[in-house]
Design a protein with these regions (language model features):
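Short helix-adjacent coil turns
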Residues: 17-24
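Acidic, turn-prone loop/beta-hairpin segments
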Residues: 1-11, 43-136, 143, 148-160, ...
Length: 167
């Protein structure tokens, strides 16, 4: 999901740069980092990064996604945050297909987002369910019934359609 969202962002930002709408490009990058990346994805995967063993598939999958995201975001910020982008590029020696400088690299030539088994409407429903669960957990934490979200045991009752999405 997050990589598809980043690919959509990349296409949109490149179009905005090509039309000299730099302020809109920066706004789109900022909104992605705040909403999708910080507000959803990192919140979901942070526990996986902290608790899974270093060689677990769940953790490695997350690290690979973060590497792809970093690669996309560095290229997108380079036209407006030149020194910052170059410094990150130089310090990130493990980036995929890394040139000597971010300015020698090209924007991606991805034509389409990757096909996924889950539609955007289904993702919206998943996030609605996630928000409902998080709200319940937060209420339990406020009532001192729970120390943290990792202590929660969650049972979700859903209809058939939601079950098929969550399965």
């Amino acid at each position: 999901w997050i990589i598809n969202e980043a690919i959509k962002l990349e296409k949109n930002v490149i179009n905005l740069y090509n039309s000299y709408s730099y302020h809109k490009a920066v706004q789109n990058i900022h909104n992605f980092c705040v909403n999708e990346l910080g507000g959803i994805y990192l919140d979901i995967v942070k526990d996986r990064l902290y608790t899974c063993s270093a060689d677990s598939q769940a953790r490695r999958s997350c690290q690979t996604s973060l590497d792809v995201l970093l690669n996309i975001l560095i290229r997108l910020i380079a036209p407006v945050l030149s020194y910052t982008a170059e410094e990150i590029w130089q310090l990130s020696s493990n980036l995929i297909n890394q040139e000597k400088s971010v300015f020698l690299s090209k924007f991606s030539s991805r034509k389409n987002t990757k096909d996924t088994k889950i539609s955007s409407l289904e993702w919206d429903r998943i996030f609605e369910i996630k928000d409902s669960v998080n709200q319940s957990i937060e209420e339990m934490r406020n009532n001192n019934e729970l120390k943290g979200s990792l202590d929660a045991i969650v049972n979700i009752e859903v209809n058939t359609d939601d079950f098929l999405i969550l399965d």
